Amino acid sequence: MKDFVTYLSTAPVIALAWMSFTAGLLIEINRFFPDPLVFTF
């Protein structure tokens, strides 16, 4: 179990988790607020 915890704390695993979280956050923001760069007044 100690080796598994060490594996989870390595940089590639943390980077993958962070990028997945960021991608999911961006997808959800774009789902609720589509095209925030285009505002028609």
Curated annotation (Swiss-Prot):
Report keywords, A-Z: Chloroplast, Membrane, Photosynthesis, Photosystem I, Plastid, Thylakoid, Transmembrane, Transmembrane helix
Read off the Gene3D superfamilies from this record.
Single helix bin
- What is the official name of this protein in its record? Photosystem I reaction center subunit IX
Top-level taxon of origin: Eukaryota
What protein family does this chain belong to?
Belongs to the PsaJ family.
Where in or outside the cell is it found? Answer: Plastid, Chloroplast thylakoid membrane
| Gene Ontology process terms (BP) | photosynthesis
* InterPro entries (alphabetical): PSI_PsaJ, PSI_PsaJ_sf
Which species is this record about? Answer: Tupiella akineta (Green alga)
